[in-house]
Amino acid sequence: MNTLVLKIDAVLSKHLKKQLASYTISSQNTYVAFAAKKNGVTVLLYKSGKLVLQGNGANALAQELNLPVAKTVFEASNNSQDIPIIGSDEVGNGSYFGGIAVVASFVDPKDHSFLKKLGVDDSKKLSDKTIQQIAPLLEKQIPHQSLLLSPKKYNELVGKSKPYNAISIKVALHNQAIFLLLQKGIQPKQIVIDAFTSQSNYEKHLKKEKNHFPNPLTFQEKAESHYLAVAVSSIIARNLFLDNLDQLGQDLGYQLPSGAGSASDKVASQLLAAYGMSSLEYSAKLHFANTHKAQALLTK
């Protein structure tokens, strides 16, 4: 997917709106003055005058609309690494035990040599031991913002008749991590989120969040395999999640498994027998099916 970003004046903005009048879509982003989608390409015109085209046909649509692409456009493909980028990723959302760690990291081209020497890659391809070794080095060298939502707080916020669901809570965490990193004076040319939902759904949930920023976002599936900034965030987040899982286990006197398989059911049933439901409220995500499975194991 390509992302084209350019600055246009009021005259061209008016002309663009006229050309795309029959293709308009809604946008929950308060900084967007006009939004449209044509030929699979999302067009966002910001109040600042910045125009963003996202989609595989971005170049073709830009030419069709007679936009000054050659002079003012910045083009970013999946493999673009030669610009300063913020990348955001989360770990823990698929695990019954443990919280959710979300990290946004800022990687400048000058950091590439350091990162490659460390062997930074998709954290899902790295062993936990390797992650725990290199994460502290990344935290020291790379500007980043880490957030950890504990299981206890997660259970207060996520579930039926509660403020968030499993998707909207991640929108809130990613948005806050990026917002706080930008508040430190970071100036990225691109912000990439490892896509966990569609852009339209992300913006729908974003509407109820307090903090917003004008920078356009790029949503990329498996972004940690394409962007070093996202890979860095993935590694730091994984380490944060593992530390939290270990601490929760120490607090309860049990080794808590990662994931949501049968091992989690077994440990959860042991915790229920030893301490009752309060132990799962403290250490696990209650809305997962593992809770009912653990309760069923107690009756056998």
From Swiss-Prot:
Q: What range(s) does the RNase H type-2 domain occupy?
A: 83-300
What EC number(s) does its UniProt record assign? 3.1.26.4
Cofactor section: Mn(2+); Mg(2+)
Q: Does the keyword Magnesium apply?
A: yes
Where does the UniProt annotation locate this protein? Cytoplasm
Which EC class is this protein assigned? hydrolase
Organism superkingdom: Bacteria
One Gene Ontology biological process: mismatch repair
One GO cellular-component annotation of the UniProt record comes to: ribonuclease H2 complex
Q: Which reaction does it catalyse?
A: Endonucleolytic cleavage to 5'-phosphomonoester
Which keywords does this Swiss-Prot/TrEMBL entry list? Cytoplasm, Endonuclease, Hydrolase, Magnesium, Metal-binding, Nuclease
Report the principal subcellular site: cytoplasm
A Gene Ontology MF term for this entry?
A: RNA binding
- Where are the bilayer-spanning segments? none
Chain residues that bind a divalent metal cation: D89, E90, D194
Cofactor detail note: Manganese or magnesium. Binds 1 divalent metal ion per monomer in the absence of substrate. May bind a second metal ion after substrate binding.
Give the family this protein belongs to, as stated in its UniProt record.
Belongs to the RNase HII family. RnhC subfamily.
| Summary of the function given for this chain in its UniProt record | Endonuclease that specifically degrades the RNA of RNA-DNA hybrids.
Q: What is this protein called?
A: Ribonuclease HIII
